[in-house]
């Protein structure tokens, strides 16, 4: 079965090939017939031209030297001069017209009889009526084609174009690589510069002032307004550390408050920076400002519910040493509570004017109520001052 199929397939292929051969032969025959017809039409056109020349010997034609007059006369089936001759009584002109009409009818097989009067060029001749224009040269920077067009020349020009394109692409790749390398170098150069700027932009830490105060309240009211912005656990201590910031616009003072793990009654308050604004004239809440000289064992009178503003001072007696000293710039202060509920409050120092105000010592005489108390009389109302003075005088009298 397979052999039969193969044989059938071969027969079909042979038949197709034979058909193709026949078609090509018929095409060739048709082309030859067309060429013969063209030769016949050319011969008839040449005979027509000869007849026109002979007719012009008996009857002169008005032939112009330019091509436009020739085409005008040839476009008409009968030249204009023949109509003029027909109006005359010449018998030969009528016969010539009939002869020319017969010749024009015989040449009607051609495409246009207006151009049949002119001899067509022979295909056998190598010369042509139109001159061949030179083909455009291949655009390349390396190879210039001056030879006539041929299959070999086209292959050379195409290879030269490909070589030029390869060179251009290679140059573009190298330029791109160089640009990428430059960009990477610029980025590497800018990164360390940015890091250096960031390091230099860090602000220097301002001086810190630490105070130790015995109090049950963590956030002591010192007259300024504070805003809590964070809290952090302290290592090896059950008490957290709170962070506060001054609420006045443009003031960067910070405060840290934490309770001591060794003595829970002590509150450590650390101030960082200095206030850039005046002290508030009306502090919040009731603030008891208790000042008195340090007596024999540091007992000064105060109510158990009130507390004092931290006022740093270096001049402390041997009986009242500071609990801790933090930085070189920091100042230590102790408010110690006695057995009867009183506080020990050292006086102010000129080295830290932002947290304390100077007060003169209260005397036992009655003139103490008339004595000038400095800035305190502008801040505290008169009732608070009179109450503190009265309590001091009463306790001194008891002693």
Curated annotation (Swiss-Prot):
Q: Per its UniProt record, what InterPro entries does this chain match? A: WRKY_dom, WRKY_dom_sf, WRKY_plant
Q: Where is the composition biased (Basic and acidic residues)?
A: 1-11, 19-38
Feature: compositional bias, Low complexity: 143-161, 184-193
Question: Pfam family of this protein, just one?
Answer: WRKY
Q: Which GO terms describe its molecular function?
A: DNA binding; DNA-binding transcription factor activity; transcription cis-regulatory region binding
Where is the segment annotated Disordered? 1-57, 138-202, 361-399
Record-annotated DNA-binding residue ranges: 215-280
Cited SUPFAM superfamilies: WRKY DNA-binding domain
Gene Ontology annotations for the cellular component aspect, listed alphabetically: nucleus
Q: Where in the cell is it found?
A: Nucleus
GO terms for biological process, alphabetical: defense response to bacterium; positive regulation of DNA-templated transcription; response to bacterium
Q: Mind listing the UniProt keywords for this protein, alphabetically?
A: DNA-binding, Nucleus, Transcription, Transcription regulation
Matching entries from PROSITE patterns are given as:
WRKY
Ranges of Polar residues compositional bias? 162-171, 383-399
Q: What is this protein for, i.e. what is its function?
A: Transcription factor. Interacts specifically with the W box (5'-(T)TGAC[CT]-3'), a frequently occurring elicitor-responsive cis-acting element.
Q: List the protein's name.
A: Probable WRKY transcription factor 48
